[in-house]
């Protein structure tokens, strides 16, 4: 991270990571958290699926100080707790894939008994379930209420 900042690229990366068109096509921002932002994934095969992205541009957990990492993981836990209260899944799966998007983020995919891929790995973007704006808003409010 220091290398990115020293080359004067921090603001460029921040703008690209936080506000790019791809992000807005895939997700809806729910709220800023202490060191991250939480988004509702638009594709809702896994009802309540969210993504938590670190607020600054970093590629991996090891780039964070212990304090930053602990704060980020506290944000992730805060979101999963809210998801659990709002949607009552059997389990929440965590995914930290950064092959194509080099920015620290966690996918949080609720899993339900008899639901898609229960007992297996969740699909990144199955492209099966999209909701109305009102349904997205209802989910966002349920998560916010429990954050």
Question: Which stretches of residues belong to each language-model region?
Answer:
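Divalent metal-coordination and catalytic microenvironments
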Residues: 38, 54, 72, 106
């Amino acid at each position: 991270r220091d290398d990115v900042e020293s080359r004067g690229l921090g603001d460029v990366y921040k703008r690209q990571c936080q506000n790019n068109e791809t992000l807005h096509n895939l997700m809806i921002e729910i709220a800023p958290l202490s060191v991250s932002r939480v988004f509702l994934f638009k594709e809702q095969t896994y009802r309540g699926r969210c993504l938590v992205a670190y607020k600054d541009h970093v590629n991996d957990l090891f780039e964070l100080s212990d304090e930053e990492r602990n704060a980020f993981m506290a944000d992730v836990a805060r979101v999963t707790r809210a998801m659990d209260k709002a949607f009552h899944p059997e389990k929440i799966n965590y995914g930290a894939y950064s092959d194509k998007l080099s920015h620290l983020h966690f996918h949080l995919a609720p899993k339900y008994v008899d639901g898609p891929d229960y007992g297996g790995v969740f699909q990144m973007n199955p492209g099966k379930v999209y909701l109305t704006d009102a349904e997205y808003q209802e989910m966002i409010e349920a998560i916010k209420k429990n954050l």
